[in-house]
Amino acid sequence: MRITIRDIQQMRDRGERIPMVTAYDYTSAQIADRAGIPLILVGDSLGMVVLGYNSTVPVTLDDMIHHTRAVVRGTQKALVIGDLPFLTYTSPEQAMQSAGRMLQEAGAQAVKLEGGVHIAPTIARLVQAGIPVMGHIGFTPQAVNQIGLRVQGRRAAEAQRLLADALAVQEAGAFAIVLELVPAELAQAITERLRIPTIGIGAGAGCSGQVQVWHDMLGLYSDFLPRHAKRYADLATIIAEALSQYASDVRNGTFPGPEHSSRMDPAELAAALGSQDQATE
């Protein structure tokens, strides 16, 4: 049985920290699900770590639906959240269409979108239509060309704006909210003032939960490692060593071995080749 947004709220109410990771394909989703991760985000971060873009801006809704479908097929328990990418929720009507596709075509159980006070009416419309929404404030990657890649909320005026954003997103009906690149003290203060869970990324330990990007935490993305990412494994090195060994085995003829091949009765082979040879004479 899948985890629900009610389960996530109960985790928060019990003081249980909530882990969330990104996943972008069937196999990764299976692994995360088996590991007991309750929230899986199909993030538009796939634009960088899977598709090779330098930001999330080029990612399309079709990209997101394609990858979300795969993640949903790979999970049985985790609640799967699909990001709405850049310029797919510029109005409540467009957001409804985009989120509807994410749930109906991709099978996601919820969507995530970026923004605070200005996006709250859109969140409210989605929630009223029965679409669970996770909010996202602080550093919002889709606005990187406007705000730059920097911590948000260090100054009092910025901090007040972020608190207002968080409260607006909550009152609009979001079931949780991501706080990205927010000072730890501010993130904790926001968390204490909200009724819904906060999921931090680069926002300190005072949030209700944490999210990490799959490729960052497993050492699969070498282009850039954010300060807030913790590398739990160096899978890129392990994979490269395995591929190098495979290439060596092929070149020196040790792979495939007899145990990797099928055999044929010699008499059957002789009969087949004999018939072929006669036909070509």
UniProtKB/Swiss-Prot annotation:
Gene: panB
Sorted UniProt keywords: Cytoplasm, Magnesium, Metal-binding, Pantothenate biosynthesis, Transferase
Protein purpose: Catalyzes the reversible reaction in which hydroxymethyl group from 5,10-methylenetetrahydrofolate is transferred onto alpha-ketoisovalerate to form ketopantoate.
GO cellular component, one term: cytoplasm
GO terms, biological process: pantothenate biosynthetic process
Protein name: 3-methyl-2-oxobutanoate hydroxymethyltransferase
Pfam family, one: Pantoate_transf
Cofactors named for this entry: Mg(2+)
This enzyme's EC code(s): 2.1.2.11
Signal peptide interval: none
PANTHER family the UniProt entry points to: 3-METHYL-2-OXOBUTANOATE HYDROXYMETHYLTRANSFERASE
Main location: cytoplasm
